[in-house]
């Protein structure tokens, strides 16, 4: 089977001491899409053929090149003193055969900072690409943001106990025009007194900005256990199918 390659943007915030040089994203030399294409190799007598198209890695890189600095600034300009903010983000594009981008979403994110994630989406929506090869395609680009501050991570059981049934408060953010997304990963940071410090979202479908704006306010008002002098990071699921 053919193995997909990835365009990787690595971003980090500077440490203490003298002002660090402004971080610059590093782009791999061989970016590609994460879309299956026709495969001539047989496995146990079966030939697998996928009718979807795929993106030329050079087309993806050319489309992203004008926006790498803006993606960096989404993180650095919104970080403030929250040096514990960091994580892995995967941006996902759906693109028509003529090169028109039809959807952009956060396929993955444990960054836990909706203002930064929203900024990344806004920049990603500005990117323009040449047409795919052999029809409609989709592709993903991972980004990594390195946290410098100290924090503790709560496991799934701890996270579930901490949040309990409070995520029902996010239901109020759904409207007739903006329905609630499904299978959403909610990442939270908890600080002194059990106060939520930051929250972010990712999902298998497009999460409307208006819903996420509302949900972020609701999530930041949740009552959570006190991590006692630490910043704790946790992730829970919302509306899983």
Question: What label would you give each PLM region?
Answer:
Residues 10-12:
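C-terminal motif of bacterial Sec signal peptides marking the signal peptidase cleavage site
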Residues 14-241:
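Charge-biased low-complexity segments
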Residues 1-8:
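Sec-dependent signal peptide recognition
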């Amino acid at each position: 089977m053919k193995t997909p390659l990835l365009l990787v943007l690595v971003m980090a915030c500077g440490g203490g001491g003298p002002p660090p040089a402004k971080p610059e994203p590093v782009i791999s030399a061989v970016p590609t899409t994460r879309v299956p294409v026709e495969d001539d190799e047989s496995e146990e007598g079966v030939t697998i053929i996928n009718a979807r198209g795929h993106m030329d890695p050079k087309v993806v890189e050319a489309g992203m090149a004008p926006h790498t600095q803006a993606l960096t600034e989404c993180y650095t300009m919104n970080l403030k003193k929250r040096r514990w903010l960091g994580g892995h983000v995967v941006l996902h594009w759906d693109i028509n055969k003529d090169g028109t981008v039809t959807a952009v979403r956060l396929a993955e994110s444990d960054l836990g900072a909706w203002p930064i994630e929203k900024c990344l989406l806004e920049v990603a929506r500005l990117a323009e690409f040449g047409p795919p090869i052999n029809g409609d395609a989709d592709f993903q680009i991972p980004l990594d943001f390195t946290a410098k501050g100290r924090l503790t991570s709560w496991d799934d059981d701890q996270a579930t106990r901490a949040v309990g049934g409070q995520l029902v408060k996010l239901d109020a953010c759904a409207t007739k025009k903006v329905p609630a997304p499904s299978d959403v990963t909610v990442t939270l940071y908890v600080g002194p007194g059990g106060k939520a410090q930051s929250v972010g979202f990712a999902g298998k479908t497009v999460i409307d900005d208006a819903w996420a704006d509302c949900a972020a306010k609701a999530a930041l008002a949740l009552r959570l256990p006190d991590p006692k002098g630490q910043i704790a990071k946790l992730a829970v699921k919302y509306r899983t199918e």
